[in-house]
Amino acid sequence: MTVSPVALRRKTECKPHPTARYWKKCDVEALFGLPFLDLIYQAAEIHRQNFNPREIQLSTLLSIKTGGCPEDCAYCPQSAHHNTNLGKEQMMDVDEIVEKAKIAKSRGASRFCMGAAWRGPKPKDVETVSAIIKAVKGLGMETCGTFGMLEEGMAEDLKEAGLDYYNHNLDTDPDRYNDIIHTRQHEDRMDTLGKVRNAGLKVCCGGIVGMNETRAERAGLIASLANLDPQPESVPINRLVKVEGTPLADAEDLDWTEFVRTIAVARITMPQSYVRLSAGRSNMPEAMQAMCFMAGANSIFYGDKLLTTGNPDEDGDRILMEKLNLYPLQFEPEGEVAEVEKASGIKVDY
């Protein structure tokens, strides 16, 4: 096993929150073991104490640089280590990305998330994505980037460009991290998350379930997320999308009730975070998605494609939200746009 320089340099320790409970793995596993309806009821109560249960935050995700990633994540079709017939593509042009963002905004998305398939950006890449962030931010949308591991100063550059959120998932239980990924360590993820927080960026951090993990390991993932200090503002919970050619293509299907339990436990342990129903939703029946919303999910990826895998189309999501009497959360602008609106009393049309 290759040990990263970060792992040798320091050991990451979980510390109790000043304002939040420290979650032991065994306590989180005990939540998973509650009777199903009792668990959903408890999660729904906590959700209503912290959010309007009818509001759903809509994000659109775009891969701005696809394929050829040097990491060997067992779940990912973009890895150069796997034969998934996914070609390597160059970075998209700024104008093309902005046009995609305009379309996403016109369809109701309040946040535009951009991902790039690399281990981490080079300085010239940070310059490029900074220009993209500024352009998208100019549309009046929140921005989120998932650009891999960051070097010193990069998070500050992204913050200065206008980035709101940085996505950096913990993927799975720290105890089984190297069963899923061999080209990096759990401590590498923690290191970048620290850089992101120190730069003043909001954190989007979640993981993937359905990768042949045990319930105890799902509890370990949730505990590791809940014990981040402070807790992530956004927590994407992904259900594995099995892609031919990846090591997890034949993973055993996760029972739908276990996924809903994961959403509920995430809501209970992270009461003020947005819990996003993320990858895998295209294979979820409407009733299952409704249970997830009841259990505390209040964010979705909106649009017919995620990075490389399918997602329900906007019309289907719009119909489902109407059936469930849900509506999109509106992004409140900041900076110059907010000042104009406040001074004039007129809502700016982007």
Curated annotation (Swiss-Prot):
Pathway(s) per entry: Cofactor biosynthesis; biotin biosynthesis; biotin from 7,8-diaminononanoate: step 2/2
Record has S-adenosyl-L-methionine as a keyword: yes
Positions annotated to bind [2Fe-2S] cluster: 113, 144, 204, 276
CDD domains: Radical_SAM
Coiled coil spans: none
Function: Catalyzes the conversion of dethiobiotin (DTB) to biotin by the insertion of a sulfur atom into dethiobiotin via a radical-based mechanism.
Protein name: Biotin synthase
The species this protein was found in: Neisseria meningitidis serogroup B (strain ATCC BAA-335 / MC58)
Gene: bioB1
